[in-house]
């Protein structure tokens, strides 16, 4: 219901009716509407980092890793439960507890990407994390844009285009040559 109507327009009475429980039973489990919302948000924000990590671990070929990571975001926004709307388009994004969860989720996704970037380039962690955040930010924004425009470009094609863009950037980073993890010029 939060996905359909937003936080402010959703009443606990409606939630109890939809869940086929009494309102007192609902309040036994969740002291308030925000607590319920945060529990659902925790459930949804746990999904994307798993998709990203799985994508990165699916191959050792970096171009394929980029493609799989990009597609993980397209998969997340295309899910039937529309959980991405609660995560990225919440009317509560200015609520500190909500913002912290979304930032943590994006940080976990960026961390996963940065591990690969750091291993392959030897860049310092802060730089690798910045690149990871750039990658996941691009994926998140483009996947949401693609879905909002009615998916006239098939998912596979849209994902491929974005992966090509991402790989052209990431593939241009110099690999460390001596196996020490030191980036040339660092």
Language model features with spans:
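Hydrophobic alpha-helical connector segments
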Residues: 39, 53-79, 132-135
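Helix-turn-helix
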Residues: 1-35, 39
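Short coil/turn segments at alpha/beta junctions that flank glycine-rich nucleotide-binding fingerprints
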Residues: 4-8, 59, 80
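Amphipathic C-terminal alpha-helical segment
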Residues: 75-79, 83, 111, 115, ...
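Generic hydrophobic, amphipathic alpha-helix propensity
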Residues: 15, 40-48, 52
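Solvent-exposed, amphipathic alpha-helical segments
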Residues: 1-4, 47-58, 138-149
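Short secondary-structure transition hinges
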Residues: 68, 75-114, 122-123, 148, ...
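Amphipathic alpha-helical packing segments from all-alpha helical-bundle domains
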Residues: 46-49, 96-121, 129-134, 141, ...
